Amino acid sequence: MMLAFFLGQPLFGDLRWCLRDLWVGILASLPLLALFFWLLHASLPALERLDEFLETHVRTIFEAWPIWQLAVISLLAGVCEEVFFRSVIQGGLARHIGTIPALALASVIFGVFHLVTKTYALIATLIGAYLGILWIVIGNLLAPIATHAVYDFVALAYFLRAHVRPRRMTRIKE
């Protein structure tokens, strides 16, 4: 909140209810989910540390949570992170340094805040850019909030409820 004040950016300045923007946000989660499923099942050595983190931390913390709690935490993450990274950081910086530099900087900051592994930080930076562009194009914070929340929920629910450990994780433990 202090950062929003310092940057002269209202927390919820570009957030308004619009069914069309909600649907755009929901549909915009599909490319991110395709990337998630591909990465989850790809045999890439750079993802081995991420697999280990997911198994030892994410699964340990969230495995016993009922599906409704996963939905709530995903919605909260979508709202809080998008308000912070898009509205406060990207929007606030755009007033001072311009739209494109603010998008780039906010995306890098988003990646750094998701620094689980170097690979995931890079992926998160690209996701941050995608969400930032979505906000610029749609002009309503609701779209990236919906994208983020749907992505988090589907990815978390799938990983915890339907995902079998990838072969590369099995090789690590052997």
Please state what every model-predicted region is.
Residues 5-77, 94-95, 165-174:
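Juxtamembrane helix-loop-helix connectors linking adjacent transmembrane helices
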Residues 48-59, 81-105, 133-139:
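Membrane-interface helix/loop boundary segments of multi-pass membrane proteins
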Residues 73, 77-78, 86-87, 143-144:
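Active-site alpha-helix of zinc metalloproteases
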Residues 119-174:
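Functionally important transmembrane alpha-helices
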Residues 74-75, 79, 92, 107-112, ...:
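Alpha-helical transmembrane segments of multipass membrane proteins
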Residues 86, 114, 148, 152:
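Histidine-centered divalent metal-coordination motifs
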